[in-house]
Amino acid sequence: ASGKGCLLGHDNSGYYQAKKLQGEDNTECDLEPHELKLSPLEIEVTDADGFTNGLAPGVADSHQTQGTKECGLLTAHGNNGLAKSGALDQNPKLLMGVFTVASSNSALTVADLTKAATSAIANTGLGQAHAAVKAIQDANPAANDNTSTSEDTAELQTAIMHLELQAATAGSRNMKEETKKIFTNKVQDTITKVLHNVYSHQITVPFVNNGKDTPLRSIPNTGELMEILAFYEQKVADNTAKTQKELTEAQQAMKTDRSGDGGCTQITEPTACNSKPFCSYNESTTDDDKKCKYNATKATENGVPVAQTQTGGSETTTEK
């Protein structure tokens, strides 16, 4: 029948391990879970015991289903009940066991969701659901404003002492004031922003997730985190060495080039020209006059000594 979408067909209804299934009307159903995007929770939906906004049971953990309040879905039998007529052999459970309909057509039993994590509710599924939701709520950095973190926090002071001041002990330092110097805004506001950025940061490392973008928060193993840190440290070191080599070559070229422009006027390709830390390709002139020129401003910004003589033409503005 049309319109069923991802309702499973008979042929593949039992293959739970598949990542994709063929639904009705040739609809392909992707069973891979989507990445969870956390956002601030409007309300605190759980506490240590259960769901804070769960339906509260009535007297004797039951609600009335008789008389004018009768609901067909919550009634065992009758003209509009679950069984239409006659009685049921067992008490049907609805909504993962939140509602239990009495086979005898007596009062409806409602599970106490506020006790989902305790033995007061005999429903493993609801207990697991509570544990999962609470874990998400607790892990959500946007829901944690860290208002308890301040310049008086001992752990933060110790981190500042070791990392910023590079000291083993505070000595005569006022660590509260030293900590305040580090932050331009309120400490708790800055900490919240940093934690949120760390939590949402994506990394791309060859040996993690086959080089694909991966949320940093999804890597709980400390050893693997240390390997990632070492990878980025080596990457920074390589880039620094490359930059130093280019600057050394540029400085040497400036010393040996007699024209005083580092050889800029000898370069005809725009890309090759602009890649030099002291040359700029002039895009503003006519095609006949386009050429590579020495750029004193760019040379200064890149730490290259400014040429003393410039016989081949110069470009003193920023790179164009």
Swiss-Prot record:
Organism: Trypanosoma brucei brucei
Membrane topology classification: Lipid-anchor; GPI-anchor
Keyword annotations: Cell membrane, Glycoprotein, GPI-anchor, Lipoprotein, Membrane, Trypanosomiasis
SUPFAM superfamilies in alphabetical order: Variant surface glycoprotein (N-terminal domain)
Residue positions the entry lists as glycosylated: 146, 282, 295
A GO term from the CC aspect: plasma membrane
Protein's name according to its UniProt entry: Variant surface glycoprotein ILTAT 1.2
UniProt function note: VSG forms a coat on the surface of the parasite. The trypanosome evades the immune response of the host by expressing a series of antigenically distinct VSGs from an estimated 1000 VSG genes.
Top-level taxon: Eukaryota
Organism lineage string: Eukaryota, Discoba, Euglenozoa, Kinetoplastea, Metakinetoplastina
First-listed, main subcellular location of the protein, grouped into a coarse class: membrane
Biased composition (Low complexity): 308-320
Keyword Lipoprotein tagged: yes
Annotated GO biological process: symbiont-mediated evasion of host immune response
Annotated spans, Disordered: 297-320
Cellular localization per UniProt: Cell membrane
